[in-house]
Amino acid sequence: MNSLKLTNSLTRKKEVFKPNNIKKISLYACGPTVYDSPHVGNARTLVVFDVLFRVLKVLYNSNVTYVRNITDVDDKIIEASQNNKEDINEITNRVIKIFHENCKSLNCLKPTIEPKATEHVKEMIEM
């Protein structure tokens, strides 16, 4: 099998990627905070993780779970709601739709799972 080298942000050295479980690879990326139209920083993260997801799928025979969250509760969202006199759900739903359109335009694969923060508030509090 070909090896994949990634930069370890802790050691700042390139290291061979060695999964904990070769039969089940997990990849997590922080997705957007949906208070305003997506920007180039969101696109960069999308493309970088899309490439990594595709490479891991090839190297490990598609045994990759890619989770990318959507932060749909945040001070910036509340502020945008107040400034624009717009319901929080209207803002977040509109921006999520634009984000997904951008993902499609960039030809990024959909993540395996895309949870919203509001769907997991209880679990976050318990952590």
What are these model-predicted stretches?
Residues 1-127:
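N-terminal Rossmann-like or analogous alpha/beta NTP/dinucleotide-binding catalytic cores
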